[in-house]
Amino acid sequence: AAPGLSHAAAKYTLRFAHDGAPDAVYSLTYVKFKELAEQKTGGKVKIKLFDNAVLGGDRVVTESTQRGDLEMGGCGTSNLGIFWPSAMAFDLPFVIDPAKKAALYDSLNNGRLGEYLNEHLAKVNLMALVYADCSNRHYATSKKPIKDLASLKGVKMRTTASPVDNLLAETLRMTPAPMGFAEVYTVLQQGTVDGELISLSDIKT
């Protein structure tokens, strides 16, 4: 902590909720944000983090932020499309060249693309502070290995709320089961779904 920071009375306390585990890749981004915000304001601003969906999943947290009931929340682009349909462009398969991903995030966080998105998000009472990469998502199953596209036929796959994700699952002859990330572990244990659409970093956590 900066000198005197631990003794300074916070003038503003901002609650930041998300559905990730504390050690998820994007969660570490939020921890760093908290550290810098408190440091740069000399302790006048305190960021209180709520992880593991204790205040709700992406949709609930974003709706709460939109209404002003919550100061900040983390939301994946797959759920952001519920509030601003154009955000679904990020869910299209192969739309982002991996070799240009760094340039994309630079434009999102520091350039014209981020400014453009915020101009439109403002119309639905939202504003993006930062875009974090949580790695590409993959199909994973708990009942049988995925050896080829034929292996996916008939699999009941947990997907996000994104219409793009669900249409892709149907195109691959799976049965999509859209649900929030916070529900995934339980439904896999219960056998309600056969697999999940998830990033490798989230599988690890």
Task: Enumerate the predicted regions with their spans.
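Pocket-lining segment of extracytoplasmic ligand-binding domains
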Residues: 79, 164-166, 174-205
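Contiguous mixed-secondary-structure segments that line small-molecule binding/active-site clefts
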Residues: 34-38, 66, 76-175, 187
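Short beta-strand-to-loop elements that line the ligand-binding cleft
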Residues: 47-56, 158-159, 174-187
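Extracytoplasmic "Venus flytrap"
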Residues: 15-32, 52-57, 203
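Alpha-to-beta junction loops
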Residues: 43-45, 61-75, 173-176, 190-198
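Extracytoplasmic small-molecule ligand-binding "clamshell" domains
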Residues: 32, 46-65, 98
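Soluble non-cytosolic domains of exported or imported proteins
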Residues: 24-28, 55-59, 111, 159, ...
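Immediate post-signal peptide segment of exported/extracytoplasmic ligand-binding proteins
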Residues: 2-18, 38-46, 122, 144-156, ...
